[in-house]
A protein has these predicted regions:
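Signature of uroporphyrinogen-III synthase
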Residues: 57, 98-102
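Short, structured active-site "lid" loops
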Residues: 44-65
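Small-molecule-sensing regulatory modules
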Residues: 2-44, 49, 69-98, 106-291
């Protein structure tokens, strides 16, 4: 029987971002809206769509060998699964998300201790209970099935909700008074899968390529030609990931320079390179950067 890795893809808010990340990493996943078993162009992987909230449970039970989910849901589950790698991406951005304690803007609540005896609505029930317990604050934590932002002040006094930008909370006239936890996506695996040499190698391959795709998102490649007489001036401008690659051109007076830099600084660096003597400057996108 051929080796096969059973991989959980998060259904819901992370689904599109995850499929797009796999595409940049070299795998095409095709998700039919009616099927929970997406196809993938790798005969060694079998995909299944699972909600991020349940991923740790199915990995722990051995239904899946590995899966992608937020570390928040792993902590919430309390299950003993392993993290293969951290992958910092979310629905809208390439940064961690926060679970925050939020209250109505019009309220006098300024800190967790002000909520003694109050009702807190959240999806992250156990984590929320632990948070208030560590502060010695007695509250009633209620599970929220969604639309949590609209519950204060009529259905709850405060909420613990996940946010990337805070814009949804502001739109619902809520203010953040504390951060309960930060979270980011992890590739998790069962202990049994990690003990299998082939599955471990396959998971390491996936982790390497996914990390490479994430690292490449904020980077661009840059190549240019420069006269040897101006090379030191050009190199002084470049904030390289590693030392730039310098190649001799057919004209002995000229060399080619290749490097990688953050996309956000390219707009400032390119004019300075030109002023320092760079010519034929080309910026190009990167699919993967494997460090």
């Amino acid at each position: 029987m051929a080796n096969k890795l059973r991989l959980g893809i998060p259904k819901g808010s992370l689904q599109d971002a995850t499929i797009a990340l796999f595409k940049r990493a070299g795998w095409n996943i095709y998700a039919d809206g009616r099927s929970y078993f997406p196809s993938i162009d790798d005969s060694e992987i079998e995909c299944m769509l699972i909600r991020a909230q349940e991923m740790a449970r199915y990995v722990d039970h051995g239904v899946l060998d590995a899966g992608l989910t937020g570390i928040d849901w792993v902590v919430e589950s309390g299950l003993d699964v392993a993290s293969v790698t951290t992958l910092t991406y979310a629905k809208q951005s390439r940064r961690k998300v926060r679970w925050v304690l939020a209250v109505p803007e019009s309220s006098d609540y300024e800190k967790a201790e002000d909520l003694e005896g109050k009702i807190i609505a959240t999806e992250l029930v156990e984590t929320c209970k632990r948070y208030f317990a560590t502060k010695g604050v007695n509250v009633k934590v209620e599970f929220s099935w969604g639309a949590t932002e609209v519950k204060p002040p009529m259905l709850a006094d405060a909420i613990v909700e996940v946010t990337e930008t805070g814009s949804s909370l502001k739109a619902n006239h809520l203010k953040i008074i504390d951060t309960v936890m930060e979270s980011e996506t992890h590739l998790i695996a069962s202990k049994a899968a990690l003990a299998d040499a082939w599955k471990r190698q396959k998971m390491d391959q996936i982790a390497t390529m996914l990390r490479g795709a994430i690292d490449a998102q904020a980077q661009v490649g840059l190549m240019l030609n420069v006269k040897r007489a101006n090379l030191d001036a050009v190199l002084a401008v470049l904030p390289a990931l590693n030392s730039p690659t310098i190649s001799q051109l057919s004209d002995s007076e000229w060399v080619a320079v290749n490097t990688i830099l953050e996309e956000r600084v390219a707009r400032d660096v390119i004019p300075r390179l030109k002023a320092a003597g760079g010519a034929g400057i080309v910026e190009y996108p990167l699919n993967k950067v494997v460090l």
